A protein has these predicted regions:
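Conserved adenylation A10 loop of the ANL superfamily
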Residues: 51-56
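Low-complexity, highly charged intrinsically disordered N-terminal segments
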Residues: 1-28
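Domain-scale recognition of functional cores that engage charged ligands
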Residues: 20-45, 59-193
Length: 193
């Protein structure tokens, strides 16, 4: 099989593709102008990947609820949504936002949005959808894990399932219905996005 060809290989055996420098030369300025034109025309949408729980951070519920603002005590959600509000102020257009949650974070995310009046975002321009779940495997043995007697344990399918989940929930049509031609994707635990 194809995978067996690589058994015993080392990194030194690998072919390295040529390095491609992004944003080199005058291309960056032109790209920024095109991006600003697309924002001003309302052709940009955003997808927030927010399926993770905040347990490693000591936060109950969705990771987006974790408070990181040193002075404002703002949550990750509030900081990220603030960036979209800044785009609205600068370009005069809202950015439609799709938020991918998981079974573990969906209800908490929806409750947060409702309790905080969508942090100033237009609720009609926010789509919340869930990523799929896959059977959980033991990392060492590869065996299926059980969540209880006769019940398979599952886990979110991760970032790789984003496009399928977006298509399955009707998100691609939703974006198109709002005039979106380009989508920027960012993660909930990146407050600088």
């Amino acid at each position: 099989s194809r995978a067996c060809r690589w058994i015993g290989s080392t990194l030194a055996d690998a072919d390295s593709p040529p390095c491609v420098r992004l944003g080199a030369g005058g291309d960056r300025d032109a790209a920024e102008r095109l991006g600003e034109q697309a924002l001003a025309a309302g052709r940009i949408g955003a997808v927030l990947v927010a399926g993770g729980q905040g347990s490693r951070l000591g936060c109950e519920g969705p990771k987006g609820l974790y408070r990181v603002g040193p002075i404002s005590d703002a949550s990750l959600f509030e900081l990220l949504f603030g960036g979209l509000l800044a785009v609205r102020r600068r370009y005069g257009r809202d950015v439609p936002l799709a938020i991918m949650t998981s079974a573990a974070t969906d209800a908490g995310t929806r409750a947060f949005l409702a309790a905080h009046d969508y942090c100033g975002l237009d609720p009609r321009l926010v789509l919340v959808f869930q990523q799929a779940e896959l059977p959980a495997l033991d990392a060492a043995s590869g065996d299926l894990l059980l969540d209880g007697p006769g019940r398979l344990a599952t886990a979110p399918d991760g970032h790789g399932g984003l496009l399928v989940a977006l298509r399955t929930c009707g998100g691609l049509e939703w974006f198109a219905g709002h005039g979106v031609e380009h989508v920027a994707t960012f993660q909930v635990d990146n407050p600088l996005a």
